């Protein structure tokens, strides 16, 4: 039995030729709601409430309602006698704030999502119904056809459609996912390899402590990550499948990228061949450019942020700091450290062999086992203007990529020292300490074009490469076709036993692997103790998301051919 709203939707969806959207994603032109005086003429399809017959149901096909008229509602004169004489205090300030602008955008997308998805569902349902009816019609014409059985099949189909409709109305929940194993740990929560029970989708489920995020005012970073993940379908960025929340936690279910991160690859290989390094840095630039195209700067790029997919290609993840600013606590900690090292005495910087620098770098990482996972962070890849809290632009990401290219080829970062303090000091005096590495026989470890690229990336902002087009024109990339990178065979392809193989990630049942996260666990315990368990967490507006393929009963007809994703949130 169709509800009244479903009948009206069917009527309106009879022919979609008049549905159009203007450049702002709102109904316009001669679209859904034309601006003209017309007379109401709504025809009810005959027999819509009749009992279904598998031979020839009277309600199908539906009457063509493409020219259905809709009353234009006349607006009575408004009484403005009680209207406020002036706007509330700080109205413009609040109206133009980032928070308000985001809520406005989310609201717009909600209504666009609502109507597009409604029509998409109705069209898909009609197609399914037509196929079932054609099948039953054929069966009814066969000799010895069983009318009772055909009626039962029709009733069974209607029941399935009813179940599909029910599932569409359900919100995603934690219990919808089966946890397989833990694959990550952060300061605010954990990441699990999980499977959605009904769709069997495998995903990486990030679970964040909601009260802790509110307590530390870190919700902005989570919302930024959610917005970035839902804004693009770029093959270079990790995709979001679901986002939802409950009283205790925020959940981000992302596509699972099974090949581990680029850091693991560097650890296993020590350093890369020049051709392999060129391939990976090319893909990293494509991934970072995809983020820049969305208007975001990552600001905290490091090898751990680049994941390797099942085919061996790069995907960028972890966009929490792309919100616009890095947390004051982190910046202040680094600024204080930079100031302190000015008063410390370090041995004069002398040229060391590649092997000595590599050994020193690895010893530092082993000695300070939480070096890479520190909540404060290391200065190895971060541009100096970011650490100093100065004004910066998107090219700080190019600095980070220059440091990663350097490390990929020789096995240590350009400013690494025997201690973290010495690393800070080297970074502070980067113009003196950035040296072209030499082999034991005196030959340069980098080719001229490699060194030319690195010094155009690790440079003062005014001398740094200014765009992706400038990057592609560098002689270092002369042999790279950026448009066909993902069709090339990568240097490394993960060997996976199944879609749930997590062998390239840390084993959270191993004490040795757990030792890497000592600082993270210690800080997390300290922060958790600050949270009042009795406090009621607020809801994040516009956080919930469900990707289109995960929506029951839709075919995506209205979205085929779109270059970008549908960044639709659900307002609950």
From Swiss-Prot:
Gene Ontology terms: cellular component: cellular bud neck; nucleus; Sid2-Mob1 complex; spindle pole body
Modified positions (Phosphoserine) in chain numbering: 17, 20, 74, 374
Reaction(s) the record says it catalyses: L-seryl-[protein] + ATP = O-phospho-L-seryl-[protein] + ADP + H(+); L-threonyl-[protein] + ATP = O-phospho-L-threonyl-[protein] + ADP + H(+)
Domain AGC-kinase C-terminal: 478-555
Record PTM: Phosphorylation of Ser-374 and Thr-544 by CDC15 is essential for activation of DBF2 kinase activity.
EC number assigned by the record: 2.7.11.1
Recorded coiled-coil stretches: none
Transmembrane segments: none
A GO BP entry: exit from mitosis
Active site: 300
Superkingdom of origin: Eukaryota
Cystine connections: none
GO MF entry, a single one: protein serine/threonine kinase activity
Record text on activity regulation: Kinase activity is regulated by BUB2, CDC15 and CDC5, and is maximal during nuclear division. CDK1 kinase inhibits cellular DBF2-MOB1 kinase activity via phosphorylation of both CDC15 and MOB1.
InterPro entries named in the record: AGC-kinase_C, Kinase-like_dom_sf, Pkinase_C, Prot_kinase_dom, Protein_kinase_ATP_BS, Ser/Thr_kinase_AS, Ser_Thr_kinase_AGC
Ranges of residues in domain Protein kinase: 177-477
Chief location: cytoplasm
Family note: Belongs to the protein kinase superfamily. Ser/Thr protein kinase family.
Assembly description: Interacts with MOB1. MOB1-binding is required for a late mitotic event.
Note: Present with 3500 molecules/cell in log phase SD medium.
Listed name of the protein: Cell cycle protein kinase DBF2
């Amino acid at each position: 039995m169709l509800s009244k709203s479903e009948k009206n939707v069917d009527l309106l969806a009879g022919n979609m030729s008049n549905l159009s959207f203007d450049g702002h994603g709102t109904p316009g032109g001669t679209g859904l709601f034309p601006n003209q005086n017309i007379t109401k003429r709504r025809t009810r399809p005959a027999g819509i409430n009749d009992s279904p017959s598998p031979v020839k149901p009277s309600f199908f096909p539906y009457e063509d309602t493409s020219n259905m008229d809709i009353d234009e509602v006349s607006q009575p004169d408004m009484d403005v006698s009680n209207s406020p004489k002036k706007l509330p205090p700080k109205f413009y300030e609040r109206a133009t704030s980032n928070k308000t602008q985001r809520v406005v955008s989310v609201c717009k997308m909600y209504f666009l999502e609502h109507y597009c998805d409604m029509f998409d569902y109705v069209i898909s349902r009609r197609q399914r119904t037509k196929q079932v009816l054609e099948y039953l019609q054929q069966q009814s014409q066969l000799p010895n056809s069983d009318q009772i059985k055909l009626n039962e099949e029709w009733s069974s189909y209607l029941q399935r459609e009813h179940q599909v409709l029910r599932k569409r109305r359900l919100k995603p929940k934690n219990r919808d996912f089966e946890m397989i194993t833990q694959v990550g740990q952060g300061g605010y929560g954990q990441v699990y390899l999980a499977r959605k029970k009904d769709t069997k989708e495998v995903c990486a489920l990030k679970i964040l402590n909601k009260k802790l995020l509110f307590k530390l005012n870190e919700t902005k970073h989570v919302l930024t990550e959610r917005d970035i993940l839902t804004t693009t379908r770029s093959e270079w960025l990790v995709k979001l499948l679901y986002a939802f929340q409950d009283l205790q936690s925020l959940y981000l279910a992302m596509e699972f990228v099974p090949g581990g991160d680029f850091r693991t690859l560097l650890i296993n290989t020590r350093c890369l061949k020049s051709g392999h390094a060129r391939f990976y840095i090319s893909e990293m630039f494509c991934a970072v450019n995809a983020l820049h195209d969305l208007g975001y700067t990552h600001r905290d790029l490091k090898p751990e942020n680049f994941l390797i997919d099942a085919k061996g290609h790069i995907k960028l993840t972890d966009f929490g700091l792309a919100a616009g600013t890095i947390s004051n606590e982190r910046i202040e900690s680094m600024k204080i450290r930079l100031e302190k090292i000015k008063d410390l005495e370090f041995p004069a910087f002398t040229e060391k062999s590649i092997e000595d620098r590599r050994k020193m770098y690895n010893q530092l990482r082993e000695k300070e086992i939480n070096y890479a996972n520190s909540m404060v962070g290391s200065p190895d890849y971060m541009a100096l203007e970011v650490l100093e809290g100065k004004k910066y632009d998107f090219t700080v990401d190019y600095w980070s990529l220059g440091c990663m290219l350097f490390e990929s080829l020789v096995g240590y970062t350009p400013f690494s020292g025997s201690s973290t303090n010495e690393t800070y000091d080297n970074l502070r005096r980067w113009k003196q300490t950035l040296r072209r590495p030499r082999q034991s026989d005196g030959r340069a470890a980098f080719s001229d074009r490699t060194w030319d690229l690195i010094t155009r990336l690790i440079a003062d902002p005014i001398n740094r490469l200014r765009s992706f087009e400038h990057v592609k024109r560098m002689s270092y990339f002369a042999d790279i076709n950026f448009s066909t990178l993902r069709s090339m065979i990568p240097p490394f392809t993960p060997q996976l036993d199944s879609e749930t193989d997590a062998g390239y990630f840390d084993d959270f049942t191993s004490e040795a692997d757990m030792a890497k996260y000592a600082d993270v666990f210690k800080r997390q315990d300290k922060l958790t103790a600050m949270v009042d368990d009795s406090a009621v967490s607020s809801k994040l507006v516009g956080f919930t998301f469900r990707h289109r393929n995960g929506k029951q009963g839709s075919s995506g007809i209205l979205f085929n051919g779109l270059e970008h994703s549908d960044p639709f949130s659900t307002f609950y």
